[in-house]
From Swiss-Prot:
This is NmrA-like family domain-containing oxidoreductase phqG. One of its GO terms (molecular function) is oxidoreductase activity. Pathway: Alkaloid biosynthesis. It is an enzyme of class 1 (oxidoreductase). Belongs to the NmrA-type oxidoreductase family. The lineage of its organism: Eukaryota, Fungi, Dikarya, Ascomycota, Pezizomycotina. Pfam families: NmrA. GO terms for cellular component: nucleus. NmrA-like family domain-containing oxidoreductase; part of the gene cluster that mediates the biosynthesis of paraherquamide, a fungal indole alkaloid that belongs to a family of natural products containing a characteristic bicyclo[2.2.2]diazaoctane core. The first steps in the biosynthesis of paraherquamide is the production of the beta-methyl-proline precursor from L-isoleucine. They require oxidation of a terminally hydroxylated L-isoleucine to the corresponding aldehyde by enzymes which have still to be identified.
């Protein structure tokens, strides 16, 4: 009898939105070919315990500690890496950056003998605008990607995420767009989605971290060499702002409409980084033809194929989530205050 040896896939950032989605998807493989290991700074956290309850192994390590990280990666066949570029600890000019953290994690994976790496990267807005605009969270990840490409892994696959549907659970994001989809107009009861012109054809790529990102990464790990050095776009749906509002009505029955703001500057500053970066993104999109992925045109074909592969491996049917389906589920969660 042949005993199948499980492939150890270690997830750095495994208690975050991206990492936990990847861990859950891999653990759902019908043949259980993956042993999922999650690196966390706090194994006693509720999020760590939740992912462990599904069958993941927890390992405590600090991303900046080469020894701890090398031990955490020991025996790993594959690694998924996502760092939190919004972490305030990585924002000080006097301290380490998200680039420093990403490089440290990649160096540890290489030292541990990891073969296959999937890295959650970012588009270079600086390159796309010929140096006119810099968004640190994207730029540092882009440069970590370039570093990882040169490290000589058996396969290295950068993945670019579309805008997250789950941002509609984040109050500062919702506030920037007139309260959509949760805050109705007091006079009419309808919800209004207000944004500046997106640019290009007006259709923006979005991804559900919860529903699709993990499956897309799962699909890569099913055939990693096929995606070596391939920039994978993680997109659930490419859709106009008008149709986002229409999808909400179709999902909930609540009247919603889209209202285009005159300019990117119509998004008023309020002292938060979220609001400032949102303004910048809409300036960029308008001036770069609506290209969310910066120098790369949007292409959903790879995401569709990877999702299909993952679902087949899990004995599930279906495909990438639509905003209509996502809003239907999100409204229930919102009403339950989850």
């Amino acid at each position: 009898m042949t005993i199948q040896v499980k492939r150890v896939v270690t997830v750095f950032g495994g208690t975050g939105n991206q990492g936990s989605s990847v861990a859950r998807s891999l653990l759902a493989h019908k043949a259980k070919i993956f042993h999922v290991r999650v690196i966390t700074r706090d194994p006693q956290s509720d999020k760590a315990k939740a992912i462990a309850s599904l069958g993941a192994e927890l390992v405590q390590a600090d991303g900046f500690n080469l020894g701890e990280m090398t031990n955490a990666f020991a025996g790993s066949w594959g690694v998924f890496i996502n760092t939190n570029s919004d972490d305030e600890a990585l924002k000080s000019l006097d301290g380490p950056s998200d680039y420093d953290l990403g490089v440290s994690v990649i160096d540890s994976a290489k030292k541990a003998g990891v073969q296959h790496v999937v890295y959650s990267s970012g588009p270079s807005i600086t390159n796309a605008t010929k140096g006119r605009m810099h968004l640190e969270g994207f730029e540092t990840k882009y440069h970590v990607e370039q570093y990882g490409r040169r490290k000589g892994f058996t396969s290295f696959t950068p993945i670019l995420c579309a805008s997250f549907m789950e941002c509609f659970f984040y109050d500062p994001f919702v506030d920037a767009f007139g309260g959509f989809p949760w805050i109705p107009e007091p006079e009419t009861g309808e919800v209004v989605f207000r944004t500046p012109d997106y640019g290009g054809k007006g259709d923006m790529p979005w991804v559900s971290c919860e529903e699709d990102l993990g499956d897309i990464v799962h699909g890569i790990f099913l055939n990693p060499c096929k995606y070596d050095q391939v920039l994978v776009q993680a997109t659930s749906q490419q859709i106009t702002m008008f149709d986002v509002a229409a999808s909400y009505t179709q999902a909930t029955g609540i009247p919603a409409r889209y209202e285009e703001l005159p300019s990117w500057s119509s998004i008023k500053l309020n002292g938060t980084r979220c609001r400032a970066e949102t303004r910048q993104m809409f300036w960029y999109m308008k001036h770069c033809g609506g290209r969310w992925f910066a120098e790369h045109e949007s292409d959903m074909s790879t995401a569709v194929a990877l999702k299909e592969s993952a679902m087949l491996s899990q004995d599930r049917v279906g495909g990438l989530v639509t905003f209509q389906a996502w809003f239907k589920k999100a409204k229930v969660l919102k009403d339950q205050n989850v």
